[in-house]
Amino acid sequence: MRNSIFSVAGRDMAIDLGTANTLVFVRGVGIVLNEPSVVAINTRDNRPLEVGMEAKRMIGRTPSYIQAIRPLRNGVIADFDITEKMLRYFIDKVHNRRLSARPRIVICVPSGITAVERRAVEEAAYHAGARRAYTIEEPMAAAIGVGLPVHEPSGSMVVDMGGGTTEVAVISLGGIVVSRSIRIGGDELDEAIISWVKKEYNMMLGERTAEQVKMAIGSAWPYRDEPAAEVRGRDLISGLPKTIVLSSSEVREAIEEPVQSIVDAVKFTLDKTPPELAADIMDRGIVLTGGGALLRGLDMRLASETGMPIVTADRPLQSVVLGSGACLEEFDVLGVVLSSSGRA
């Protein structure tokens, strides 16, 4: 059955190549893959051992000669070779090369990246087997993915908070009118929790533990009956395992600085928005997408600080890849929002 689905010649795909997760959308099928953007490498021969979920399970648990690497940092490629290997693995996983022509590939990129960084993404796609590579800015993809009328002469505003970046953009007539891209996302929140626990409790947390704490009891706004959680790490003084109880209010204090940076980016963008478009946004609301949209109370925090209505996307984790996929499904209409170096 899988072969029959992917054997159509030139089955095109859209890829949300995120710092935390990679999602793949195949034209005519939908989302077919959602895995962590992690590669486990044997440093003795530079050979990838595992990619995706299996590689993520290895983070912090590998012998010295095996490294679990996240090849993207802050939304851009930090390790080109490893990114290419990861892309090739994901493409091969969903695309039958023996029966299919090479696909056209659309890859999402942060709105604030340089031309060199954008070109690196395209090159990684070509090296991984693309016939033609396109890029689309993440806030535009997110807006399309949540069904905002991006081609109309009215303002729509999206806040897409991913693992490495937060993208804030006002869109009208198929273009980004005002945008702000900051290299702060879910990873920064995890790091803030690690730093805070280290400072307050003399305890070191692992990356995965910090992420689990954020998802379980993290919040950007106070609420009733706030929970607490047992957290295990390593005592920095004795070097022995240690367990503490963290409250939701403590985690909120830990992540306050990066959360405020996100709020400031939204306020900056609103301040630069033309009055007519600002009026449209007041009617329609600011749409939250990305994994950060799942942070409890972020909508309340933004509503309080901006005075604007806040709407959380129905499928915040999939919004960007769904919008990129829509560009393939309706290429004649939406293809104008894509960029390409033009390499054949």
Regions found by a protein language model. Give the residues of each.
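Nucleotide/phosphate-binding catalytic cleft detector across ATP-hydrolyzing
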Residues: M1-M161, A169-V287, A293-A344
